[in-house]
Amino acid sequence: MEQAPAPKISFVSLGCPKALVDSERIITRLRAEGYELARKHDGADIVIVNTCGFLDSAKQESLGAIGEAMAENGKVIVTGCMGAEPEQIEAAYPNVLSITGPQQYESVLEAVHRALPPIHNPHLDLMPPQGIKLTPRHYAYLKISEGCNNRCSFCIIPKLRGDLVSRPAAEVLREAEQLVKAGVKELLVVSQDTSAYGVDLKYAESQWQDRAVRARFYDLAKELGSLGAWVRLQYVYPYPHVDEVIELMAKGAVLPYLDIPFQHAASSVLTRMKRPAAQDKTLARIKRWRETCPDLALRSTFIVGFPGETEQEFAELLDWLEEAEIDRLGAFKYEPVQGAASNALPDQIPAEVKQQRWDALMARQQKISARRLKRKVGTRQQVIIDEAGPNGAKGRSKADAPQIDGHVYLSSRRPLRVGELVTAKIDRADAYDLHGTVAGF
């Protein structure tokens, strides 16, 4: 008897790396049940759109993706952050099959089952232990918790994803171990608030291999560093205990890289943001961090044009950047977000002023980045290869996260492979990227 064709699903994943991990988990479950992935909407039986709802611009992108799926297919399931407040989706597209919020994996699967029942195939390949990944094979995002306990005035993430819920340390480490066994060379540790990991569990111990490991930021980072892959820490809130992890970086256990969204430098703006406001103390910490680990690369994000931001406060931000010498920077022009407390603040900044300040911030950062990268000319850097061609390759140093940071462009006298780790001599630098030659050949 001929086997019925497997039902096909097209998948759209929008938003941050945390949402990408949610997409990977849904796809892994669906593939385990026999569903196949289609490359195009019109070749699928159904479309799933994992939305982003953090900013109004992200909501518009999500609505556009839903509209495209409706036009090309007509059978659409919506999930993700925007689904937590479904009214806007329902108003625009009343005929979508289902709308669910973030992390509601079972609800998504139930919606798929209702619209497109699975066909059992006893000859299906078993799922790989690491699950289905949407990233290239050599790196993977490792999500260690959901939600956030902070209440920044501009942010609605706690409303969308709830309070902090950490995974047991052993569970995280088992997943990381499977990823490394499958060939992953770089683990990108992500969450809404990575350095708060384990607070909700009261740092409870769990058994991994032959020992107990505490659900604590430092302990988890140390154990991840023992697996033999690059470990990159992202979305770190600047709590005092972050200082402890710098020692691990100095020893080479985890990458000398910290992604800390400082958001601003003027204490008055930070107070309105409901963020830590003692940036003078932060400068002293950054100095100590670099004394302990001279190779430390700092990435951060900042918001310009926050309600009430004066010219003096913006000037404080520029001056602080010069002193802190942030290596990598992302900047956002403040957007009111439905449900955010900052919407009620007085003195909203005109759009043209936000643009001027954004331009000035990025111009200042370009000079800082160029200055810091120039210091690497003549040094040797370890590089992971992301793209390879017949005469060279594009990769990243330990100071560069995928998708958001710079690149290292390499020439080589031998073919290079994606995922390969090589040592490169840096020949020159520009504002954001390095250029070099693979050493030893």
From Swiss-Prot:
InterPro entries: Elp3/MiaA/NifB-like_rSAM, Methylthiotransferase, Methylthiotransferase_CS, Methylthiotransferase_N, Methylthiotransferase_N_sf, NA-bd_OB-fold, Ribosomal_uS12_MeSTrfase_RimO, rSAM
Cofactor requirement: [4Fe-4S] cluster
Name of the protein this chain belongs to: Ribosomal protein uS12 methylthiotransferase RimO
Role according to the record: Catalyzes the methylthiolation of an aspartic acid residue of ribosomal protein uS12.
Family: Belongs to the methylthiotransferase family. RimO subfamily.
Enzyme class: transferase
Catalytic reaction annotation: L-aspartate(89)-[ribosomal protein uS12]-hydrogen + (sulfur carrier)-SH + AH2 + 2 S-adenosyl-L-methionine = 3-methylsulfanyl-L-aspartate(89)-[ribosomal protein uS12]-hydrogen + (sulfur carrier)-H + 5'-deoxyadenosine + L-methionine + A + S-adenosyl-L-homocysteine + 2 H(+)
Domain Radical SAM core per the UniProt entry, residue ranges: 134-371
Keywords noted in UniProt: 4Fe-4S, Cytoplasm, Iron, Iron-sulfur, Metal-binding, S-adenosyl-L-methionine, Transferase
GO process terms (BP): tRNA modification
Domain TRAM: 374-440
Residue ranges constituting the MTTase N-terminal domain according to the UniProt record: 7-117
EC number from the UniProt entry: 2.8.4.4
Annotated GO MF terms: 4 iron, 4 sulfur cluster binding; aspartic acid methylthiotransferase activity; metal ion binding; protein methylthiotransferase activity
Gene giving rise to this polypeptide: rimO
Pfam families: Radical_SAM, TRAM_2, UPF0004
